[in-house]
């Protein structure tokens, strides 16, 4: 079978579902999400502490948050990446709330902010001590109720489709790689289907399950990074920073 979409998202955690909702609600086209197990099985639901974001501007600001993050990372962190994540955090929190995620609030309606290790101010938004599960719940409900998002549960992305699969020769010296979608295994038919898309996004998370001792679910196998590596024929940048056995 051949399926055609505007957006193909491989992975069903907070990254994959957030991207799906953003493009679908902006009416940018038809979206398909590929989940290798069920939609609710992702590392997102295991996160407990909370989400850091500058919200109380009376005592906090972006510069403080950036500085705290750089210190916590022993100044190894990419400054521009840290700055982007910190400054965009309030907007992302607003989006999560609009999609139905509930964060704990005080009696006056303001967020009940906590402070965790490395933070100089109270800026941790949370939902009791199961913040990840609440984010996963809210996003799943929003995704399932969105008519422009098709969800393929228990489907496994086998390979990214590039010009190599169309007969072109691809090597490490090839200046760029075109992506046309992915080959996906359908467990019901035991056949590999073709999913063509204008945009393909890989949101498959870390590789904690390859270690003997880990708190990660068994699906965290890092196969998404492997698919990208095979497709582009290049070494992945910052592989040592990849989430692993936390």
Feature-to-residue mapping (PLM):
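Core beta-strand elements of the Rossmann-like FAD/NAD(P) dinucleotide-binding domain
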Residues: 2-5, 190-199
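Positively charged, low-complexity/disordered segments
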Residues: 229-246
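Glycine-rich loop(s) and the adjacent beta-strand/alpha-helix scaffold that form part
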Residues: 199-230, 234
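N-terminal Rossmann-like FAD-binding beta1-loop-alpha1 element of flavoenzymes
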Residues: 7-33
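Conserved N-terminal/central alpha/beta ligand/cofactor-binding core
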Residues: 29-30, 35-180, 185-191, 209
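A glycine- and small-aliphatic-rich helix-loop capping segment at beta-alpha/alpha-beta transitions
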Residues: 25-28, 52-53, 216-222
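Hydrophobic/aromatic ligand-binding patch that stacks against planar heteroaromatic rings
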Residues: 18, 22-23, 43, 200, ...
């Amino acid at each position: 079978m051949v399926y055609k979409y505007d957006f193909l998202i491989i992975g069903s955690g907070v990254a994959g579902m957030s991207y799906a909702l953003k493009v679908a609600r902006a009416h940018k086209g038809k979206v398909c999400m590929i989940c290798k197990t069920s939609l609710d099985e992702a590392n997102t639901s295991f996160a407990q502490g909370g989400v850091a974001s500058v919200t109380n501007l009376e005592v906090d600001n972006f510069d403080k948050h950036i500085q705290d993050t750089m210190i916590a990372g022993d100044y190894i962190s990419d400054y521009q990446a840290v700055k982007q994540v910190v400054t965009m955090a309030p907007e992302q929190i607003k989006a999560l709330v609009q999609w139905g995620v509930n964060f704990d609030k005080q009696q006056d309606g303001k967020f009940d902010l906590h402070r965790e290790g490395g933070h100089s101010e109270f800026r941790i938004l949370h939902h009791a001590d199961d913040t990840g599960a609440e984010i996963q719940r809210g996003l799943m409900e929003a995704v399932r109720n969105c008519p422009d998002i098709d969800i393929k549960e228990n489907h496994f992305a086998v390979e990214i489709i590039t010009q190599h699969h169309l007969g072109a020769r691809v090597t490490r010296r090839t200046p760029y790689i075109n992506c046309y979608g992915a080959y996906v295994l359908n467990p019901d038919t035991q056949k590999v289907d073709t999913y063509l898309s204008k945009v393909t996004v890989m949101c498959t998370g870390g590789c904690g399950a390859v270690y003997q001792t880990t708190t990660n679910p068994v699906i965290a196998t890092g196969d998404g990074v492997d698919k990208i590596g095979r497709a582009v024929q290049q070494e992945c940048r910052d592989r040592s920073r990849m989430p692993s056995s936390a």
